[in-house]
């Protein structure tokens, strides 16, 4: 989770949304990413999508042995990618500021662990308070 938090902090420094993610195969990080929708003027570069992209093409067998760590509960798009690639476990930093598709993931057999990390909660709460319009755009509310 520490590496995912570092990615989220990088996103904030770049003027973006503080959501970070890492894809871990066995014990090695193979992909790191953070939400770069603002920085890249992208509609899809959420933290999890960026981590998957930065992992590069992998055989399906690799994804089936991975854990994806994300600082915030994954949205429908990111959850869909997790399901598509057969990632069996998701560790979520927090789901108090946004609860994504955890039930969908669980219904497909994905092990979902929510740790309610105080740094993740604080980072998102501060961002949402300071940037409500950007946040609502990111989650598809406006």
Identify the residue ranges that each predicted region occupies.
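Zinc-dependent deaminase
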Residues: 1-11, 80-142
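A short, polar/charged loop-to-alpha-helix boundary motif
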Residues: 36-50
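Stable alpha-helical structural segments in soluble proteins, enriched in small hydrophobic residues
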Residues: 4, 8-11, 47, 51-55
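Local cysteine-cluster metal-coordination motifs and their immediate loop/turn environment
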Residues: 45, 68-88
């Amino acid at each position: 989770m520490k590496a995912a938090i570092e990615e989220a902090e990088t996103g904030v420094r770049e003027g973006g949304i503080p959501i970070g993610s890492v894809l871990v195969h066995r014990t090695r990080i193979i992909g790191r990413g953070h939400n770069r929708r603002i920085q890249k003027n992208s509609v899809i570069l959420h933290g999890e999508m960026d981590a998957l992209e930065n992992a590069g093409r992998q055989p399906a067998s690799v994804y089936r042995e991975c854990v994806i760590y994300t600082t915030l509960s994954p949205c429908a798009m990111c959850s869909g990618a997790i399901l598509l690639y057969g990632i069996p476990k998701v560790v979520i930093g927090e789901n108090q500021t946004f609860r994504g598709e955890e039930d969908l993931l669980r219904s497909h057999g994905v092990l979902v662990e929510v740790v309610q990390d105080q740094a993740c909660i604080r980072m998102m709460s501060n961002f949402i308070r300071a940037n409500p319009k950007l946040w609502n755009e990111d989650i598809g509310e406006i």
